[in-house]
A protein has these predicted regions:
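Cytosolic/nucleoplasmic/matrix-facing N-terminal domains/tails
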Residues: 1-171
Length: 172
């Protein structure tokens, strides 16, 4: 069973595509590739989009069960841990994308392009936690304003801050 996260308005975003194929139309394929070549946790990072028949709204679902919380509603330390983990997973996906996209003539080139597009999203608050598992909504979209660039999840996070500094060892 999937966990509902939120509904997005399509008119507030611009869909990203490669070779005329919208990234969100390839959810099942990219998640299969990610799970096969990386891990189920990597694949769970990518929320499942459900477009309404009129293509005006998108319902987003997590592929894991649990309590869903937007990153903006988490305590600061927990939010930073989630962002760091999301960035780590995203960098692995980006690396796979780069490997597959090296040869523009290969069968994997389009899949590599799609893997890169799933890391693009319009706003920093597109990240959710489902019982600690990072889940990205609104992926495959850029902000609606003409010329506005999407966020790149692979640039999120970084090193988790150390709680206490380790004292240097004195030379004997």
């Amino acid at each position: 069973m999937s966990v509902f996260l939120l509904t997005s308005q399509r008119n507030a975003m611009r869909a990203l595509a490669s070779q005329g194929i919208f990234a969100t139309d390839c959810h099942a394929q990219v998640c299969s590739i990610i799970a096969q070549h990386l891990s189920p946790a990597h694949a769970a990072l990518i929320a499942e989009p459900q477009h309404d028949p009129g293509q005006q709204r998108i319902d987003w679902y997590a592929g894991v069960n649990g309590t869903a919380t937007p990153v903006s509603a988490l305590p600061a330390e927990e939010a930073e841990r989630l962002r760091a983990r999301a960035g780590e997973l995203a960098r692995d996906i980006l690396h796979l994308s780069e490997q597959w996209g090296k040869d523009a003539q290969s069968r994997e080139a389009l899949a590599g392009q799609m893997l890169a597009l799933v890391l693009q999203h319009p706003h920093e608050d597109d990240l959710w936690s489902v019982d600690g598992q990072p889940v990205l909504v609104n992926w495959g979209f850029a902000p609606g304003a003409v010329g506005a660039m999407p966020q790149d999840l692979s640039r999120m996070g970084g090193a988790i801050p150390v709680a206490a500094a380790v004292a240097p060892v004195a030379a004997a």
